[in-house]
From Swiss-Prot:
It comes from Eremothecium gossypii (strain ATCC 10895 / CBS 109.51 / FGSC 9923 / NRRL Y-1056). It holds the Pfam family Med11. The gene is MED11. This is Mediator of RNA polymerase II transcription subunit 11. Belongs to the Mediator complex subunit 11 family. Component of the Mediator complex.
């Protein structure tokens, strides 16, 4: 069953956000690695550490904004595309009957011990 274009667009946007979040983790790893080397006395890595930190925050900000926009888009879609959904409740009372049946079986089992 083919998906509507709006769904394809949302999935593509979420895929890009996922890639950006992976990049955030890679920048965090590079930042921590550079910081560890800097603590070991490699002072020449200071500019590299600063660049990793800038990349981390830039990517984090971009992915956060994109995710917030997708959430806003989903909120808008809920009111227009997804709802109203008619839900007819069926089998009313079966859950209570099943619960009573299970409790009776447990009473029999516990009583026979």
């Amino acid at each position: 069953m083919p998906q509507p274009d709006s769904v394809k667009a949302r999935l593509a946007a979420l895929d890009r956000i996922d890639d950006e979040l992976c990049a955030v983790l890679q920048h965090a790893q590079a930042t921590i690695g550079a910081l560890a080397e800097l603590k070991r006395g490699h002072a020449a890595l200071q500019p590299q550490l600063e660049q990793h930190v800038r990349d981390y925050y830039r990517t984090l900000e971009h992915s956060t904004v994109a995710l917030r926009n997708e959430i806003r888009e989903l909120d808008a879609a809920v009111g227009t595309q997804l709802l109203p959904v008619n839900i007819g409740k069926r089998a009313v009372g079966q859950d209570q009957e099943k619960l009573s049946e299970q409790l009776a079986q447990m009473d029999k089992y516990v009583g026979s011990m």
